[in-house]
Amino acid sequence: MQLDPKGWFTEVCKEGGLAFSLAIREKLHAETTPYQYIEIYQTETFGRLMVIDGFIMLSGRDNFFYHEMMAHPVLFTHPHPQRVLIIGGGDCGTLREVLKHDVVEKVQQVEIDERVTRLAEKYFPELCQSNDDPRAHFHFGDGLRFVAEAPANSVDVIIIDSTDPIGSAEGLFQASFYADCQRLLGEKGILVHQSESPLIHLDLLNKMRAEMKKGGFPQVRTLTYPQCVYPSGWWSATLAGHTLSCFRERDATAKIFPTRYYNVDIHRASLAVPEFLRQTEESS
C-alpha cells in the first residue's frame, strides 16, 4: 500500500501474507472524495492503474478478465435478461460488457462515489465508451437504499460489482441485502456478486454463500477466473437464484460481439468446482 522510492507500487494483503507490486512510471492523479482516497498511476507494463484506499481496483492490462466474467456468465444464464441493475461498477467496465447484449433494454448503475466514474471517463476512456448508450441510466448514491426502495420484480439481473466488504460496502454482503435483491428479481431473476479470492478469502466466500441462501436464494454457484492484480491472482464471482441451470449455450456460441477472455468453454470451465471448494460447500 505504498509507492516506494524505487518506483514500485506495492499492495500488501495481510490476511494472505503476500504482496503484489507494479513498476510505476508516474502518478497521474490523487484525490480524497467524501467516501475514499483515489489514486491513478501510469505503470510500466500494466497500463493505467486505479487504486482506492491503497487497494488496486483495476489495471488497463487485465481488467477484461473481471469485467467479462461479471457480465457474460450471468447474462447467458438468465433466459431473457432485459432489465439489469449494477450496484457499484463505477469504472463502467462491467456496464460496457452488459451493453454488448442486444437483448438488454435497460441498465441502471448505482455507484456511491461519482468521482470514480468521472476519473474512469478521463483516465480509462476505453471502459466508458458505452456510457452514452441510451439504455444506460446512472444513479450516484447508496446501493443499499436504492435496492431497498426499488419496486418488486423490477429487474431480471443484478450485478454487484462492489469493493471488498469493508466500510460502505460491508452491507452488500449481508442476508438482509440479498433478501431485498431477491424481492426485486422475483423467481426468475439472477444475482451475481464478486466474491474475492477462493484461496485467501475462503471463510468470507462460504459466509457470503450462506448469507445468499438466508436471503432467499436456494441455488448458489461460484465461478472462478484469473485476475493478476488482485490478491493471489485468482478471483471469483458467485451466482444466486432460484434456478441456475439455463445456460444459453447456443446464444453464447453465436455471440457477435468481441470478448478477450469469455467464451463458451471458459463459461463451462469457470464453474468447475475445485475439490477443496467442493469439500467446504458440502460441509457448510
Curated annotation (Swiss-Prot):
The PABS domain extends over 6-242
Per UniProt, subcellular location reads as: Cytoplasm
The residues that hold spermidine are H67, D91, D161, S162, T163, D164
What does the record list as GO biological process? spermidine biosynthetic process
Q: What is its EC number?
A: 2.5.1.16
Protein role: Catalyzes the irreversible transfer of a propylamine group from the amino donor S-adenosylmethioninamine (decarboxy-AdoMet) to putrescine (1,4-diaminobutane) to yield spermidine.
Subunit and interaction comment: Homodimer or homotetramer.
Official protein name in the record: Polyamine aminopropyltransferase
Q: What is the lineage of its organism?
A: Bacteria, Pseudomonadati, Pseudomonadota, Gammaproteobacteria, Chromatiales
